[in-house]
A protein has these predicted regions:
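Nucleotide-activated donor-binding/catalytic signature segment of Leloir-type glycosyltransferases, i.e.
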Residues: 267-284
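Short acidic-hydrophobic, aromatic-tinged amphipathic segments that line or gate anion-handling sites
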Residues: 101-108, 280-284, 347-357
């Protein structure tokens, strides 16, 4: 008996068809029930008990800290919010919340099946691709809001990543223009684009300040590559690690989380080669703040951790090969300019060239910090991380005001 093979694209399409059919039957049945309540009760049926006012969805353990300041704000205001998560050990379960109703809804297709049948006024998520892949708009959700999980450009998502949201919550005013350009050229409706700050940076700022200083500090270099063939670890490997370890300094390598999935063979090879080297630490922890706190300087490429380190630690950064291939990203459709985040790194960072690797100790020693570099870091921070320390409250205020607008409009139409 031959086994049938369904390629991933066809499988995704079939899943979408199945979800669409299920959703249709669900909404038809629900409509019939409400209609019967109306007829038999002589008035409008009671509100659907499964409906939610506010829903927040977290797709992965990496993003739970994006939502913690928002959940804390809902708790402070005594406003109930449904928090759906695809991370079984989400910290929200043990946070002692009274007004945050946390629920694990599974991962992947199981989570999307739940989300696609949702009834809610407002859904907030950091997951892109609404209306593009498995995640479809529910007819019973009034407003979809996307919150950025980086202070970088809003166009640095894969194609159409944020096109079909009703609002995108930004970390800085600078992100608006490119979003508006794509809306106009693609003929899609304008979204609400409130600037709310950066929630996870606010969260980490509090935590990193509480980490005690080392009793005996040794000079430490943090190597933080992005993933993919252009990332510095994949591209240079031993050519960069060998001279770094020859310095005798402590070297922390923090691979991108995706590298463990897409570049596992490379990581295993390098780990085995340098096994037993006491100066080399491989950091796979969820939180990056402990390595950043220890580091005196960071070496990276185009990874978003550059901004975490720059904005939270205010220490010098060296970049190698900071350019990124934009063809798969929304930013590719914005002509005439590179994304702000690419130019910003080159402005406040120090370039490290491949031919400098053999003398990297001297290069780093001579790449001292300066008042000018500190000024440029501060400028980038002010641009990309507005409302520092206020983001959770800002997101709550936006959602509460949007819910009032939706209900006012709905009641006016009845």
């Amino acid at each position: 008996m031959e086994l049938l093979y369904i390629d991933p694209g066809t499988g995704s399409m079939l899943f979408s068809v199945l979800i669409g059919a299920t959703a249709t039957l669900y909404f038809l049945a629900r409509a019939v029930v409400l209609k019967l309540k109306f007829i038999l009760g002589g008035k409008k049926g009671a509100a659907d008990k499964s409906a939610h006012t506010y829903v927040i969805y977290n797709e992965d353990k990496r993003y739970q800290n994006v939502f913690r300041p928002v959940l804390d704000a809902f708790e402070r205001h005594g406003t109930e919010v449904s928090y759906f998560t695809s991370f079984k050990d989400d910290e929200a379960f043990s946070a002692g919340y009274k007004f945050v109703k946390s629920e694990y809804i599974g991962e992947g297709n199981a989570a999307f099946a739940r989300l696609n049948l949702l009834s809610a006024d407002i859904v907030l998520a950091t997951t892109p691709g609404l209306g593009v892949y498995q995640w479809k708009r529910s007819k019973n959700v009034k407003h979809y809001a996307h919150i950025l999980h980086s202070p970088g450009d809003a166009t640095m998502y894969r194609l159409f990543g944020i096109d079909y949201f009703d609002s995108v919550l930004l970390s800085g005013e600078y992100q608006k223009d490119d979003v508006r350009y794509l809306e106009k050229t693609r003929g899609i409706k304008e979204k609400d684009l409130p600037v709310v700050g950066c929630t996870y940076l606010d969260f980490y700022k509090e935590r990193i300040e509480k980490i005690p200083a080392e009793e005996k500090h040794e000079f430490t270099v943090l190597l933080s590559p992005s993933w993919g063939p252009s990332g510095i670890l994949a591209k240079y490997g031993e050519r960069l690690l060998d001279p770094l370890l020859a310095t005798g300094w402590n070297i922390i390598v923090r691979p991108h989380p995706q590298s463990k999935i897409s570049e596992a063979e490379m990581l295993e090879r390098l780990s085995k080669k340098y096994e037993g080297n006491g100066n080399l630490i491989w950091d796979y922890e969820t939180d990056n703040i402990y390595s950043m706190k220890k580091a005196d300087i960071m070496i990276s490429d185009f990874s978003g951790i550059i901004y975490d380190y720059t904005f939270l630690c205010d220490k010098p950064v060296m970049y190698v090969n900071a350019d990124i291939e934009l063809a798969l990203y929304d930013a590719y459709d914005v002509p005439g300019q590179k994304p702000w985040q690419v130019n910003a790194v080159k402005d406040f960072g120090i370039e490290l060239k491949e031919e400098q690797f053999p003398t990297i100790k001297e290069v780093i020693q001579n790449a001292s910090d300066s008042e000018e570099l500190a000024r440029r870091r501060a400028k980038a921070k002010q641009t990309a991380w507005q409302f520092e320390g206020q983001s959770g409250e800002k997101v709550y205020e936006f959602m509460a005001e949007k819910e009032r607008q939706l209900n006012f409009t709905g009641s006016s139409e009845q």
